[in-house]
Structure formats: C-alpha cells, structure tokens
C-alpha cells in the first residue's frame, strides 16, 4: 500500500525543458467562420433564478434588462469574491467535520465530499422528489430514509511514526444547516458558486472516464468523444453549463428527446416538453460554427413530428463537428480546498479570471494531495488532476506537454483510476501523494474551435477540442472522418445534407497544413503581463489524443 513521508513529499522533478520534449511547426491560415448569434425575443438565454431549473421568471428578466452591465474589472472582482467565499465555506465544513489538520484540508477527496454535500443540500427539487418516493416506499413496507440529511466520506489523517495515512469516516449533515451556512457565507443564494462546482465535477468526469455507452445508446460512434464535453453536467447548471457542453452532448440530448417523442406521440403537445426540446435545439444552433451546420439544425427545428430522419440529421451534424468544431467554453476550476488556501498562499489580488493568468498562478501555488487507490501511480494521478482542473480531456496532449514540461500519456497508458474511491476500496490506512505537475508556461483559454486548419491525428478519439489559445496545428484523424462521410444523403433535406458533407470534404482537402490561433503565444508562468511571448513547440512523437482506443472505466459503470 502506498505511503508518504511526513518530512518531505517526493513530488518528482522535471528533467527536460519544453524545448527538449517538443519541436515546432507552422503554416498557412484560413479565417475563422464566426458563429452567428441566434437570439429570438422569446428565447433569450438568461441566468437561472434557482439551481433546480433552467427557467427564468418574467420578473427576473425585467430585472436583468434594467441592470447595468458589469465591466470586465467588476466581473473579475466578483469572481474573486466568489472563489474566496467558496474557500471560507469549505473551512467551515471542515471545522464541523472535525478535520482541522492542513493535510486533511488539502485532500482532494475531502474537497469533493464537501462539494457533493453542498450540491445535494441545495437541490430542493431532488429532495422533494426523494421524500415523495420514500413516502410511497414506506407504504409498501420498505425502510424509511431521512432525506433532510445528506452525508459523504471524508478522510482523517493517521500518523504512524514518520508516515501518514488516511482513514475513511462517514459524516452526515442536515441539508438545511448546510444551505444556511452556504448562503450566509456567500451573502446570497450563490448560484454561480454552485454552477462553478458542477462544472468542476463534470470536467473531472470527462478526464477520468470514457462515455462509450452513452454515445452508443444514442447511435453515435465512440470516436466522437471529443464533442461530448460536459455530458455529466446536471440540467440545473443552466446557461453556464450549456456554454461548457460540447456539440455532441447537445446532439445526444436532442436524440434522447426525439426517442421519447417517438414512443409517446403526445409528448410534444405538452407545452413544457415542447419548450424544453426547442431550447435544446436553439442551444445547439448557437454552438454551430458553420452556416451549413445551422441549416441542418433549422431542418430539425422545422420538423412537425420528429423521428428517424431527424436523428439521422443530428448524427451527421455530430460527425461534422469533429471537422468544423463548435464553440465550447473552457475555464479553470480548482477544488474548493485550494480556494480555502488563498489567504495563506499570499495570493494578493482582488481580481480573478477563470480563463486567464490568476487561475493558473493559483494552481501553481497550491499543494493538493490525493488518496492513492490500489495500483495508482502518483505522477499519472497528477496528470489526471491537471487535466481535470483545466477541462483538458479533449485538448491536444502535445500542447499540454509543452506548457508543463511533462510528457503526457494516453488515458489507457496511465496507471491510475479516478479520484472517487468506491465504498469497497475504502480501507484503513490509505496512502496519498502530492499532485506534482505544474505549469512552466501559461496561455489564455479559448472558446473557439480553432477552425482555421486541421492536421493529421491518430485513431480511437479522432479530433481535439482546443482549450488553450496558442498557435498550433489542430489534430484530426482524416481517415476516420472520411469513413464517416460515406453515408446516404437522400431524403427531404438532401440539399442541406449535401452542403454539409461538401463543407466537410472541402475542409478535409484544404486544411491539411498550417496552424490555428495564428499569432497566439505562450508565456513564462512568471510573465503575468505577457511581455515576452514564446512560440509553442510541438513534438509529433507525443500522442495527440488522450482517449485513443481506450480501456478506461466507463462513467456508467461507476458504483457510488
């Protein structure tokens, strides 16, 4: 079993410079096709009034219209306030749990336990559903469960001579008590903080698990995984969650809805169901980068009785998104245990950007520790943690390697499992290790698909979803995409399908060389003001794709 020396944690050293592990390329450019904004008056995208649903009351809508728009500085100040308050809430939770040692508070699993308890406590809609279901179960003679309480597994430190271990303890909280503590700390309902945590959990799931079963269930090929970002985000994450979701995730939601509508033809006569379906399609249209993609979504929106033809259209749309990538937001989400350390780290700023320098500097300052499950390698676990924080599951690994000075591996080559420890693996005296991979260079994050060019890629996963805005080629497995292009385009919308397939073919033939994000450079981690831009070197021998013919656990197999 793994253990850790109390006097000094061996985190490993980086023996190579980024230049030694990478080498550069460059080439021609094409302009980005910027997505048009779809904003019909009746479908304005607005903030969630509550974390339980993605609807907006008319009063809140009026309030937003009269509200003064925040400046970038004001936004960064409010974001800083949010992350600091989340850290304060975590400290209060740990005091209540009786876990006061720094090592216990640095533990990623303890942060995740506190986050899950908070999400459960604030999900009033789910709590109400559980209570009603339990009332029915009790009438049938089943055991009564108190759904006013929620709990999680925390880990308490145990010292043994010069070695420290962690032992699991189950701690229960009253939901109302957790909600009150959170609202008091945040000074409001704190919906943005809840969304922030949900996105962090989703990014961790994207990295730790493959989603082959979920893709196959809706008729999509597992190789489209790079379009499946945010697939485990709950609906209550609202507009913030939609920005993080990949195009394939929204396609899968629409296909599932059509499947339900085909089984129950009365479903779309219900105004609430019809509105929800239309909202998914409008969000999908907003994601699309090319007019041909938007036209295909319009065909589906115009269908009076959605069926097999619409599913075929959406399947083609998902395939096109590996060539012409949709708009997917990226952000750095750190465990709230790191936020709790901001005062001690000397992180003296009053502004914080989740897509810029401040989040990356805070990541580098932190000393997060993770439980090691049986067979886990500490360095491999560090790669999982880095990619989780930066939402980089589908980023080109050559870019990540250059930014960190560490050679990144395929998911199936990593000797480690996810961060959640199943009940059957929770034993006394578990080892832990410091997450050691740090940034040597930094670059702003992007929401663009980087559609100027497409280079050559590998197999398994067949495309990337860029996270960092740095000039580089975009990896794409053209052989795999060409296999997808051989499909029937006959039917009611043959012209629309034909145009989309032509666009994909044109992209494949023209975009063979060159770089995306032209002119975007990386910077030394100490260079906050971007005074010395550095061209990112790309080494072709490092694998492009994290999920290449993968053998990782599937999210659907998780035993919570």
UniProtKB/Swiss-Prot annotation:
Task: Kindly list the places in or outside the cell where this protein is found, as annotated in its UniProt entry.
Answer: Virion; Host nucleus
Name the Gene Ontology biological process terms. Answer: symbiont entry into host cell; viral penetration into host nucleus
Q: Which protein is depicted?
A: Nucleoprotein
Query: Which cellular component appears as one GO term in the record?
Result: viral nucleocapsid
UniProt similarity note: Belongs to the influenza viruses nucleoprotein family.
Where is it predominantly found?
virion
Q: Describe its partners and assembly state.
A: Homomultimerizes to form the nucleocapsid. May bind host exportin-1/XPO1. Binds to viral genomic RNA. Protein-RNA contacts are mediated by a combination of electrostatic interactions between positively charged residues and the phosphate backbone and planar interactions between aromatic side chains and bases.
* Modification after translation (UniProt): Late in virus-infected cells, may be cleaved from a 56-kDa protein to a 53-kDa protein by a cellular caspase. This cleavage might be a marker for the onset of apoptosis in infected cells or have a specific function in virus host interaction.
Organism of origin is: Influenza B virus (strain B/Ann Arbor/1/1966 [cold-adapted])
Record InterPro entries: Flu_NP
